[in-house]
């Protein structure tokens, strides 16, 4: 089975999962964090080099204040809880997103986990937090304009533009998985997903299993990736 180098996941459906069970939405987020923990282990078993998890979008600030505060706390708790696994399995963590507007406890944990895991090289776990694809592109344009205004000469190509993205050295996702039955990217990795293969599950994220993950990987391994060209020239 051909294994993708980079898998990205839109972990959707936590709130609906909780609602269906008559539980507070935060219970869905807690269960979702457990499934992410499992997905990291499955990815390690398969030899996947990069795993990106869409955890908190720039649009999620519109949610109720109590839920947003819980998600901030959950980020900190999740990093603390996973440190043993990260060290043991040599998993590097990088955060993809904007620091503006985040509470100090989140910024501190962001810096801490990136620093503590920066030398690990078995797999890179990328947590998209306070992230929006359009905002990333706009930020890149602003950085380019700033450099030009300071006298830097820039030949604008796809590759030079890429250098202004949040994590320019991370390869584009080979496969993007989305749960919950929604069939859209929802402002996720808009630049990087140009040639990504997509796989959609009707299941809600807290119900996602290893069998589901393997099914998506198997589907990917059977696809022919043309990148706009032809397979045989």
UniProtKB/Swiss-Prot annotation:
EC number per UniProt: 2.5.1.-
Keywords noted in UniProt: Magnesium, Metal-binding, Transferase
GO terms, biological process: polyprenol biosynthetic process
Residues at the active site: 12, 60
Cofactor(s) it depends on: Mg(2+)
Sample GO molecular function, one term: magnesium ion binding
Co-factor binding details: Binds 2 magnesium ions per subunit.
Similarity section: Belongs to the UPP synthase family.
Family annotation (HAMAP family): ISPT
Record text on subunit structure and interactions: Homodimer.
Name of the featured protein: Isoprenyl transferase
Organism: Thermotoga maritima (strain ATCC 43589 / DSM 3109 / JCM 10099 / NBRC 100826 / MSB8)
